[in-house]
Amino acid sequence: MDVLRSIALFVLAALLEIGGAWLVWQGVREHRGLAWIGAGVIALGLYGFAATLQPEAQFGRVLAAYGGVFVAGSLLWAAVVDGYRPDRFDVAGALVCLVGVGIVMYAPRPS
């Protein structure tokens, strides 16, 4: 059950961080205004709290593993929201990152 909770928290963190960064990008680069930037900053702040909810106690392990989730999530966000079409190297790289997440977070370790 901890693994499912952990995965759900990684998804939440990705939505908050990637979504927040996207909102800031839209506000600044696409000139959509301060409301977009403000919403992005709030989402990015909430992302910081999402990581603290992980069942794993080691900050470095959680953030290192989240980096792999961020890579895959960013490509997925770009495909769904911005119409970006990842190529086979994008997909392969994202899959490698997700395998790394699995190893870093969920490999059996001695107690």
Swiss-Prot record:
Task: Quote a single Gene Ontology cellular component term.
Answer: plasma membrane
Q: Where are the transmembrane segments?
A: 7-27, 33-53, 62-82, 88-108
The record, for SUPFAM superfamilies, names: Multidrug resistance efflux transporter EmrE (SSF103481)
User: Which UniProt keyword terms apply here?
Assistant: Cell membrane, Membrane, Transmembrane, Transmembrane helix
* Xref: InterPro entries: UPF0060
The membrane topology of this protein is: Multi-pass membrane protein
Location in the cell reads:
Cell membrane
Q: Which domain of life is it from?
A: Bacteria
As for family, the record states:
Belongs to the UPF0060 family.
**What name is this protein filed under?**
UPF0060 membrane protein Krad_3114
